[in-house]
Design a protein with these regions (language model features):
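Extreme N-terminal tail/first-helix region
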Residues: 1-31
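Charged, gly/pro-rich active-site loop segments
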Residues: 2-11, 93-158
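A generic local structural motif
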Residues: 24-27, 52-53, 139-141
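Short linear motifs in intrinsically disordered
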Residues: 26-33, 74-81, 143
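A short, compositionally biased
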Residues: 33-36, 80-85, 149
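Short beta-strand segments
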Residues: 35-69
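Short conserved beta-strand and strand-loop elements enriched in small hydrophobics
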Residues: 40-41, 84-96
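A short mixed-secondary-structure module that forms the rim of ligand-binding clefts
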Residues: 58-89
Length: 158
């Protein structure tokens, strides 16, 4: 599914901008990711090299929910679909697992988990995507739009 979510920030709208933003966040996220975020490590589909990307990662039990906001255009999603074994560093620790697309029957549970958690970092993130004052309801609506318009994944942790 191709994502339709647009932002007032042209930096976020470009593929290069997203990579640059992730690269800027990476050193901080490697030290201690904010609640609800993490560093996803994949294997490059063409090069076989290790690739790391900062992502919103919601851990619930032995599952972690992620969304490729830009849908199938997202490079890390293409890497995951080609080689589903991933490593994920979240606040609780570093885990390995197998990533797959969210199935229709588990979508309501995944949507609730993805949209439920709010941290301070979400308020900053909201200001990059939307104009206006960030409120919990507006942040959840933004996350729901990402989930509905993007490509949701679940990582089954080992």
């Amino acid at each position: 599914m191709e994502a339709k979510t647009r932002t007032h920030n042209p930096f976020i709208n470009s593929a290069r901008g997203g990579r640059v933003l992730s690269a800027m966040q990476l050193p901080l996220f490697l030290l201690r990711p904010p609640a609800g975020y993490g560093v996803l490590t994949t294997t490059g589909r063409r090069t076989g090299k290790t690739r790391r990307r900062c992502v919103r990662a919601i851990k619930r039990g032995d599952r972690v929910y992620l969304v490729a906001i830009k849908g199938s255009r997202t490079g890390w999603l293409r890497n995951v679909l080609a080689s589903p074994e991933v490593r994920l560093r979240v606040r609780e620790g570093t885990f390995t697992g197998i990533a797959r697309e969210v199935q229709a029957q588990e979508r309501p549970e995944a949507t609730d988990a993805y949209c439920e958690l709010l941290s301070r970092f979400e308020y900053l993130e909201y200001s990059m995507w939307r104009r206006g004052r960030a409120t919990p309801a507006r942040i959840r609506e933004l996350h729901r739009s990402w989930f509905d318009e993007g490509s949701p994944l679940v990582v089954e942790l080992r």
